[in-house]
Amino acid sequence: MNSKNNIEQKKINVAVLGATGVVGQVFLHLLARHPWFELSMISGSVSRNEKTYGDEVQWVLPVPMPETVENMKLEALHVDMLKNRGIKIIFSALPANVAKTVEPELRENHFYVFSNASALRYETDVPILIPEVNPQELQCIEEQGFPGKGFVVTNANCSTTGLAAALGPLRKFWIKEVFVSTYQSVSGAGYPGLSALDIMGNAIPYIPGEEDKMNRELKKILQLEADIYAHCVRIPVLFGHLETVWLRFEDPIETDDILAAWQSCEFKPRGARTLYAAQTVCEDFHSSPGEGARAGLPQNENSYITKLNGRSLPSLPRQSVVYMDHEFFPQPKMSFWGFPSGMQVFTGRLRKEGDKIGFTLLVNNLVKGAAGGSVANAELFIHTYEHFFKTGERQ
């Protein structure tokens, strides 16, 4: 069965909440031409209801506003209206304090919510999902009551996402300690965000809540028992979060081992409902039972994720982590590089000092680290539960 072609025959109606903010704008940009999803409703603050999107929004992305979005009306959020339009999937770019109330209500009304908000990330039955890192966590939606009920799936904090993508292939080496300093762009603070007087020609050495998020989320996503030490700084850059990372491992490791792990890992989703036979794994990873048990990774060396029509989900690159072999790279101005744009994590300056491995990484905080991550999560859901989504019957 050709999943991609079947889904494309009839696009799936979706809605975006918080559509006027920076992350909301990225959602609209990604969904306007998406091969699987039809943008059917957008919502902003109450004061903007029934107003035309193009007239109301200060567009801040480095790409033009999609014409299909420009003339859409911002609408109030009503459950009956969503149901009447056949909308089941909702992308949430709501502030955490609003999402804490709205998203559980949508779940109770049988909607499938893919959220960028942090409000529900730490609930035990709500996954923090990164398809190429922990796809097996999608099954948490069944703990929330799916298919009888709706669910909420979250993506990680933007800085966490980039680091988790880089560390995912390295779990087999048994990470003992993680030291990370982040240099985060102003777009991560939203719009209008920080005052120019605060940030221009300056750096702010503390971002409230950010360091705790990285610690908690990395441990949940990667199932790490490692000690994590994070320091987060805001810098006067528009897009892209740069991170410097030092790792200490349980066993001796060389930089060539790190490179091989990054280069050999591709995301190849399994067929519908067989996803949980394995996590995303490297094709050169053949662990012994002891190593697999210790790292929390699959012990069956043949349980590799198979190809879907020669490529991955529409929003995911075949190679999620790309190493740049030049001492001056990566840089934040490259955050929209790659294909799909903004969805690759770039690493560089890989080196060994004593018993520690160091490297630099760059993640696009708005695409990979926010809206693009949520869209990829929805794609993984559609692919995994395709039979149910088309027939309403569990396979």
Where are these regions (language model features)?
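N-terminal Rossmann-like NAD(P) cofactor-binding subdomain of oxidoreductases
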Residues: 2-200, 227, 273, 284-298, ...
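Charged docking surfaces used in two-component/phosphorelay signaling
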Residues: 187-395
